[in-house]
From Swiss-Prot:
A Pfam family this chain is assigned to: Ribosomal_L31
Any GO BP annotation: translation
Gene coding for it: rpmE2
Segments traversing the membrane: none
Similarity section: Belongs to the bacterial ribosomal protein bL31 family. Type B subfamily.
Matches recorded under InterPro entries: Ribosomal_bL28/bL31-like_sf, Ribosomal_bL31, Ribosomal_bL31_B, Ribosomal_bL31_sf
Keyword Iron-sulfur appears in the UniProt entry: no
Keywords: Ribonucleoprotein, Ribosomal protein
Species annotation: Aeromonas salmonicida (strain A449)
HAMAP family for this protein: Ribosomal_bL31_2 (MF_00502)
Keyword 4Fe-4S included in the entry's annotation: no
Gene Ontology cellular component terms for the protein in this record: ribonucleoprotein complex; ribosome
Protein name: Large ribosomal subunit protein bL31B
GO MF terms held by the record: structural constituent of ribosome
Length: 89
């Protein structure tokens, strides 16, 4: 293998801002920010908006849209095109 072409693999501290959860994971991600972890060591620090701790699929808090709602929304958007030839009485 050629020297000096591979990225540096190290432990990185990820912070999910939505769930306020920290993950210590091996990564090659580059960052200038550092933060001290609960074990006393200082690690590179990266913030996340969504992770497995806050994503609806993993938390089980999914929002389902009913079929009736989708049909009603379609009617609101495109109903005017289907009612052109009909009398409004």
């Amino acid at each position: 293998m050629r020297p000096n072409i591979h990225p540096e693999y190290r432990q990185v501290l990820f912070h999910d801002l939505t769930a306020n959860t920290y993950f210590l994971v091996g990564s090659t991600l580059k960052t200038d920010r550092t933060k001290q972890w609960e074990d006393g060591n200082t690690y590179p620090y990266v913030t996340l908006d969504v992770s497995s701790a806050s994503h609806p699929f993993y938390t089980g808090k999914q929002k389902q849209i009913g079929k009736e709602g989708q049909v009603a929304r379609f009617g609101q958007r495109f109903g005017q095109f289907f009612n052109k030839g009909k009398d409004k009485s």
